Amino acid sequence: MGRRVFEVFCVLACLAVSVYGLAQEGHPLTGTWSGDWGPTGTQRNHVTLVMNWDGKNVTGMINPGPDAIPLASVFLDVTNWTVRIEADAKDPSGSPVHISAEGKLDDIGSYHRKITGTWRQGAAKGDFRVTRD
């Protein structure tokens, strides 16, 4: 009987530790985010953001792949859950283009949280919506 109680205790302890580990999500911006941005509801550009918390800063890229754009800075204001993202890219002719996005982080308690706001890329301005995958 004592051995059986010990085995049950060990199983429950292992389950408790594994559930606690799953609950740890880390920084609220960490992950892959996908969505779109554009000046109108019909003129949209697909965008993927990959963001990681390195212990001091949020780093990452826009549209990972051969033409990936490194994020210059990411700022999260936890008092009102606003996000500011800055990056520098090049247009098709090779000229520099500044990208800035400012938005609000919503559905904080959900894994599939969202950021919505304003996207500026060079002279173009529109809204954006991304959801964490």
Describe these PLM feature segments.
Residues 1-10:
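Bacterial N-terminal signal peptides that target proteins for export
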Residues 9-18:
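Bacterial N-terminal signal peptides
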Residues 19-23:
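Sec/Tat signal peptide C-region and signal peptidase I cleavage site
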Residues 24-133:
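Central antiparallel beta-sheet cores of small beta-barrel/beta-sandwich binding domains
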